[in-house]
């Protein structure tokens, strides 16, 4: 009977799978539908597949990280002085400022290609340019660049100075005393004003200014600085460059022309370790332009801005300490930037067009269409000059550097705070000594309006300072034949008597600050004084 009730209680139950159908023993239907079961199996298999792929990618990345270098790369892990550089730097070295093509040839191929390029480019240069190139090679051979990982150049003392002073701790190093006249007088190539403003003088031939500290390691995404072209003559006989470089850097070379340097040249050329012809990839600079350089820590990317607009990302995976550098050169001593060199440059299409228009107008019939050559090119650049025989004064160039002490033209740098640090550091701004805060003091202002009144006739805290006893001077003595004279008797007095009188007077002197005494004490003192005077007169007569 109970089995029949159980069967009636589950009329829709099916038999258990794998057993013969039994109408008596049945269970509830809790199985998943066929479509849902297929979806679940598909998801499980898909997750397993993705997990295996992720594991394979992790293994490949580990292998490339630790076992991807070959013997040739490991052989370059030491400098010429035998000191090793960290693993991190050489993993970032794959596209580190090698040349304008951003290629990474081997050491042998690099040397051979350099020899081929020297044989091609050096004959096109002036003797002055060739001399600079040879001096640069010798300089960096004797003093190789300090290629160190980012943030390793500074010691603990330098870091503390930067932390305390902030941007105020940065400044450009002064000019090297290498340019003198026939009398040995120093002719500075540039002046440093207000720590960060560099003015290149008329004595400049070719020089560069480097900052005392490298790019800082702050807690932002990037670090950024801007340089404003404060003074630069139109059609100038000089060029300048702005960029980043290692230390020590040849002081007689502009940035971008020596190893481990990158620069934005005023001609619009982008130079990366390139002393020869470079490509014109950027706008030409004029007076009032603002050039910016930034460095992103995460990717090691260097980017350039012009008048607040980002132009390009120049390099990637740069992981070394770089210094801010400014340089200028007198182009009259070069062939590259004179008329012939500018004609040979394939990027100077506008110059060739202006020169052809100049020749056409000057040879035309109408004199009103005459164009002065000074509007196209400086007269000093019409031919190559020799600095040893023909001295040409350089046009003055003034560049102002902004590390964050002022607002940036590049908006992103202001929003994300890419400055070198705080303006005054942890110490803060120094106190003001110009008197503006003092003038706002209410007490001092009230004192100026109502000067205090001092008592004149009343006996004040210090007593009667106007009494005759305290203000009278001792009687003057006249001297005759070396002996003091008595004013009353007009006779000489012996020195012994004078000494006795002096002692008596010293005892009788009252202090300058008098104190009121009782009347009895004052009367007795006057009697003693009269007795002493009578005694002294008797001694004199005797």
From Swiss-Prot:
Q: Which residues lie on this side of the membrane: Cytoplasmic?
A: 1-39
What ranges does the record list as Basic residues composition bias? 523-542
The UniProt record lists the keyword Transport: yes
Q: Which residues form the B30.2/SPRY domain?
A: 158-345
Q: Which residues lie on this side of the membrane: Lumenal?
A: 61-542
GO BP terms: namely: protein transport
Q: Where is the composition biased (Low complexity)?
A: 467-481
Where on this protein are sugars attached? Answer: 197, 204, 348
> What subcellular locations does the record give?
Vacuole membrane; Endosome membrane
- Membrane topology reported for the UniProt record: Single-pass type II membrane protein
Where on the tree of life does the source sit, at the highest rank? Eukaryota
Transmembrane portions of the chain? 40-60
Q: Which InterPro entries match?
A: B30.2/SPRY, B30.2/SPRY_sf, ConA-like_dom_sf, SPRY_dom, Ubq-SigPath_Reg
Chief location bin: membrane
Q: Where is the composition biased (Acidic residues)?
A: 450-459, 498-511
Q: Where is this region: Disordered?
A: 447-542
UniProt entry keywords in alphabetical sequence:
Endosome, Glycoprotein, Membrane, Protein transport, Signal-anchor, Transmembrane, Transmembrane helix, Transport, Vacuole
Any one GO CC term of the record: endosome membrane
PANTHER family with a match to the protein in the record? RAN BINDING PROTEIN 9-RELATED
Similarity section: Belongs to the SSH4 family.
User: What is this protein's function per UniProt?
Assistant: Components of the endosome-vacuole trafficking pathway that regulates nutrient transport. May be involved in processes which determine whether plasma membrane proteins are degraded or routed to the plasma membrane.
Q: What is this protein called?
A: Protein SSH4
């Amino acid at each position: 009977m109970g089995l029949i009730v159980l069967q009636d209680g589950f009329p829709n139950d099916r038999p258990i799978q794998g057993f013969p159908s039994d109408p008596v023993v049945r269970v509830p239907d809790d199985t998943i539908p066929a479509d849902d079961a297929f979806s679940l199996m598909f998801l499980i298999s898909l997750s397993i597949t993705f997990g295996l792929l992720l594991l394979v990618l992790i293994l490949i990345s580990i292998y490339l990280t630790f076992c991807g270098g070959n013997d040739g790369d490991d052989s370059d892990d030491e400098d010429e002085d035998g000191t090793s550089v960290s693993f991190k730097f050489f993993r970032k070295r794959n596209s580190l400022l090698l040349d304008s093509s951003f290629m990474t040839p081997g050491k042998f191929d690099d040397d051979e290609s350099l020899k081929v390029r020297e044989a091609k480019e050096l004959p096109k240069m002036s003797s002055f340019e060739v001399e600079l190139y040879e001096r640069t090679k010798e300089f960096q051979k004797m003093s190789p660049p300090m290629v160190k990982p980012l943030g390793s150049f500074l010691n603990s003392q330098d870091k503390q100075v930067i932390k305390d002073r902030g941007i105020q701790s940065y400044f450009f190093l002064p000019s090297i005393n290498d340019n003198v006249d026939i009398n040995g007088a120093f002719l500075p190539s540039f002046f440093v004003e207000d720590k960060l403003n560099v003015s290149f003088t008329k004595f400049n031939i070719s020089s560069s200014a480097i900052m005392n500290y490298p790019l800082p390691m702050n807690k932002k995404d990037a670090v950024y600085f801007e340089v404003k072209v404060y003074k630069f003559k139109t059609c100038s006989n000089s060029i300048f460059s702005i960029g980043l470089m290692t230390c020590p850097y040849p002081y007689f070379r502009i940035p971008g022309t020596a190893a481990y340097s990158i620069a934005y040249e005023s001609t619009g050329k982008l130079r990366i370790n390139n002393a020869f012809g470079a490509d014109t990839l950027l706008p030409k600079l004029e007076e009032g332009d603002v050039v910016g350089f930034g460095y992103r820590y995460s990717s090691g990317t260097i980017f350039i801005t012009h008048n607040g607009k980002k132009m390009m990302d120049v390099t990637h995976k740069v992981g070394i300490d770089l210094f801010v550098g400014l340089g200028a050169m007198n182009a009259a001593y070069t062939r590259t930037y004179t008329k012939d060199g500018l004609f040979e440059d394939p990027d100077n299409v506008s110059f060739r067009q202006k020169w052809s228009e100049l020749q056409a107008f000057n040879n035309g019939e109408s004199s009103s269409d005459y164009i002065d050559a000074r509007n196209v090119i400086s007269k000093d650049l019409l031919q190559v000059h020799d600095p040893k025989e023909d001295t040409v004064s350089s046009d003055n160039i003034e560049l102002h550097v902004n590390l964050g002490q002022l607002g940036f033209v590049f908006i992103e740098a202001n929003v994300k705070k890419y400055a070198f640090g705080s303006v005054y550091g942890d110490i803060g701004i120094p106190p003001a000594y110009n008197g503006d805060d003092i003038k706002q003091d209410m007490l001092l202002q009230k004192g100026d309006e109502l000067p205090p009144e001092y008592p004149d006739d009343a006996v004040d805290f210090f007593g009667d300072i106007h009494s005759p006893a305290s203000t009278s001077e001792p009687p003057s003595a006249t001297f005759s034949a070396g002996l003091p004279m008595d004013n009353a008797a007009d006779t000489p007095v012996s020195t012994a008597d004078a000494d006795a009188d002096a002692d008596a007077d010293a005892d009788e002197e009252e202090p300058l600050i008098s104190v009121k005494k009782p009347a009895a004490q004052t009367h007795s003192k006057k009697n003693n004084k009269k007795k002493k005077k009578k005694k002294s007169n008797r001694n004199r007569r005797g």
